[in-house]
Amino acid sequence: MNERTKMDFDYDLFVIGGGSGGVRAARVAASKSGARIGIAEESRYGGTCVIRGCVPKKLMVFASSYAPAMRQAVSYGWDVATGAFDWPAFQINLEKELDRLEAVYRKLLKNSGVETFDLRATVTGPHEVCLADGRKLTSKIILIATGGVPSIPLIEGAEHVITSNEIFHLKKLPKRILIVGGGYIACEFAGILNGFGVDTHLWYRGPKVLRGFDEEARDVITQGMKERGVTIITETETTKIDKIEGCFVVTDISGVEHTFDLVMYATGRRPNTQGLGLEEININLDGAGAVEVNNYSQTPIASVYAIGDVTDRVNLTPVAIREAMAFVETAFNGNPTPVDHSLIPSAVFTQPEYGMIGLSEDEAQKREPIEVYTTNFRPMNTAFIDEPNKVLMKLIVSQATRRVLGCHIVADGAAEMIQMAGIAVKMGATKEDFDKVCAVHPTMSEELVTMKSPIRKA
């Protein structure tokens, strides 16, 4: 880094947003000799994933799974009784863990030599940011990594609802909750709260929840949620929410009123770009408010980059981290590196759990002739148990190349399984490659290598 650069700017890189992507970019860039890095975060370091998303949600999934596990243990000979769930005790442990993780993020930044600012920052020029306390700082490169925020429709009484941000901080669990939305966040929290013993209702305006995912997987998950006790009502909407005597009266599109102790909206997320000042320096935002970038995460303003959910490309934490690494290669190492957004494995922590990589059956058949290998069965651990727990294993195969175009798993531990299956799919494995692998018996996942004949062709 030459002396002129050091003199011209306060920083070589200034990052706005202390989530997984922003922190990774700051840390790795700071490892460059002489590079001065600053980062601003208005909330808590760790961002959505660590503080109010993936991590606390997964811990809630664990917590909610113990009640059915204890019920099932009786069938296996254990003399156990399911007691009441202690929400305050769980919250104390949860907050301790989140504090620990945030401290790790802060320590990593400090040890890397990154200067941190616990303040909101906005962009006021191609090389300038303004902190909430009025200080203006200059930087050779600015990286926007502000993530996304919950989006709530404008309806009468919207001020009464909570979102996934607030669900972790409830003083007590409601007896009866309405969750509005049909995406993965809505379905995940429906399963969690139902597992805690909350009378859980999910309303969705579309015909079927989990739009955009594989149809067969959606059906298995929906059936599993209902059998576990979640009330799912589709093709309905809320028109008004009134707070009456400590409860919430929700009016649906038919004019019928329903009473709940709490209403949670999980109707999607939007890029966190409001008030950042990007429009003032001619950085393009799309219709959803996402920062428009090229394959190298660069905006039309050469000195400004953006990564993660704020770009609304693939909104997953591991993707934001990969985008951060590619950004450093591009901006600091002189090695322009695009991010590969194809064939990314992902999971939905519904109950039952869903893991997938590649194309859905509908997507694949629109592209080329395919074969579909699928099996739906009760797993071995339910041999003594009269409870709903169906497993789906599904491979979508190209008729022409024999490559596995998509893999879908609905089962306990599906997320763990899809990580391994994803390696094969990413490498371009064919159905015959899967067939060559000896099964591990007895397991659920052995079905991935023992399905010999296609169920259907399309």
Label every PLM stretch briefly.
Residues 54, 144-205, 279-281, 285-296, ...:
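Glycine-rich dinucleotide-binding loop and its adjacent helix/turn
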Residues 159-174, 257-333:
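FAD-site-proximal beta/loop scaffold in flavoenzymes
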Residues 17-20, 42-43, 180-183, 213, ...:
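Glycine-rich Rossmann-fold phosphate-binding loop(s) that bind the pyrophosphate
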Residues 22, 183-186, 320:
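Catalytic nucleophile loop
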Residues 16-21, 25-43, 48, 55, ...:
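Flexible, glycine-rich terminal cap/loop adjacent to redox cofactors
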Residues 2-11, 28-35, 40-173, 206-210, ...:
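Glycine-rich flavin
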Residues 7-19, 173-183:
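Beta1/beta-strand and adjacent pyrophosphate-binding region of the FAD-binding site
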Residues 14-16, 121, 137-147, 179-180, ...:
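Short hydrophobic core segments
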